[in-house]
Amino acid sequence: MNHFSKFSVTKRLLILEVLFSAISFGISIYIKVFGRSSIVTFFLLCFHLVPNALFLFPWTIITTSFVDANVFTLLSSILILSVYGVEIERSWGHKEYLLFCQFLTVIPNIAVLIPCFIAYKITDSHYLLVAIIQSTTAIQAGILTAWYQLYSCKKEESSNKFLCPLSKYLIYLFLSIHLFYVFQSFPWTYFCLAVSGTCISELYVLFVHPVVQELFHLESHTQLPI
C-alpha cells in the first residue's frame, strides 16, 4: 500500500505548505537584503497580511493557512499531516477529509479576523488590522483533535497503535506550546487559531461527520490506499 497516492489530499496539503512557506521565506530574505519595494509589498499582501490584504486579495484568507512562519512550525505541520492526517484520510476517505480541511482553513481565520476588526473599531489602532496569521496552526490543532476523537475513543482502529497512549495529551501539549509562544512575544493570533481549530474539529466530529456519512452513505475506509 502506498503511503501517498496521487489522489491523496494530505499529499496536496504538504505540497501547498512547503511551496507557500518557501515563497514567504524568499520574500523575507529579499526584504532583508534589498529592502522594501512596491513589488515586494504586493507579494507580502498576497501571502502575509490579513485582513488588510483581504480587501485587495480575497484568496489570502485561504493561502495564509498554508504558510508557516518558521522552520519549527513547518516541520511540526509536516509531521502531523504525515502521521495523523493520513490516518484520518484513510478512515474518512478523500472527499470528506477535503471537506474537513476546508473547514479548518477558512473558519479559524474568520474567527480571528472578526475580533481584530471589532477591536480596531473600538481602539482605532491600525496595528490590529495587520494581524499576521500565516500559520497552519488551526489545521494542525484540528487534525490532532479529530484523531484523538476517532482513535482514543476506540471508534476506529488505528494503524499507529504506539501513538494511542499519547493521544490524550497531544492536543493539550500543542495548545500549551502555542500559549507559551504568546508569552514569548509571538503573535497572539497563533494561540487563537489553535483554540479555534480545536473547537471546530470537535464540532465537526460530533455533528457534521455523522451527517456527511448519512447523506452520502459513506462508510469507514480504513484500507483506503493513500
From Swiss-Prot:
<feature type="topological domain" description="Cytoplasmic">
    <location>
        <begin position="119"/>
        <end position="191"/>
    </location>
</feature>
<feature type="transmembrane region" description="Helical">
    <location>
        <begin position="66"/>
        <end position="86"/>
    </location>
</feature>
<feature type="signal peptide">
    <location>
        <begin position="1"/>
        <end position="26"/>
    </location>
</feature>
<feature type="transmembrane region" description="Helical">
    <location>
        <begin position="192"/>
        <end position="212"/>
    </location>
</feature>
<feature type="topological domain" description="Extracellular">
    <location>
        <begin position="87"/>
        <end position="97"/>
    </location>
</feature>
<keyword id="KW-0732">Signal</keyword>
<dbReference type="GO" id="GO:0005783">
    <property type="term" value="C:endoplasmic reticulum"/>
</dbReference>
<dbReference type="InterPro" id="IPR035952">
    <property type="entry name" value="Rhomboid-like_sf"/>
</dbReference>
<dbReference type="GO" id="GO:0016020">
    <property type="term" value="C:membrane"/>
</dbReference>
<dbReference type="GO" id="GO:0006890">
    <property type="term" value="P:retrograde vesicle-mediated transport, Golgi to endoplasmic reticulum"/>
</dbReference>
<feature type="transmembrane region" description="Helical">
    <location>
        <begin position="42"/>
        <end position="62"/>
    </location>
</feature>
<dbReference type="GO" id="GO:0030137">
    <property type="term" value="C:COPI-coated vesicle"/>
</dbReference>
<dbReference type="Pfam" id="PF08551">
    <property type="entry name" value="DUF1751"/>
</dbReference>
<keyword id="KW-0812">Transmembrane</keyword>
<feature type="topological domain" description="Cytoplasmic">
    <location>
        <begin position="63"/>
        <end position="65"/>
    </location>
</feature>
<feature type="topological domain" description="Extracellular">
    <location>
        <begin position="213"/>
        <end position="226"/>
    </location>
</feature>
<dbReference type="InterPro" id="IPR013861">
    <property type="entry name" value="TMEM115/Pdh1/Rbl19"/>
</dbReference>
<keyword id="KW-0472">Membrane</keyword>
<feature type="transmembrane region" description="Helical">
    <location>
        <begin position="98"/>
        <end position="118"/>
    </location>
</feature>
<feature type="topological domain" description="Extracellular">
    <location>
        <begin position="27"/>
        <end position="41"/>
    </location>
</feature>
<protein>
    <recommendedName>
        <fullName>Protein pdh1</fullName>
    </recommendedName>
</protein>
<dbReference type="GO" id="GO:0005794">
    <property type="term" value="C:Golgi apparatus"/>
</dbReference>
<keyword id="KW-1133">Transmembrane helix</keyword>
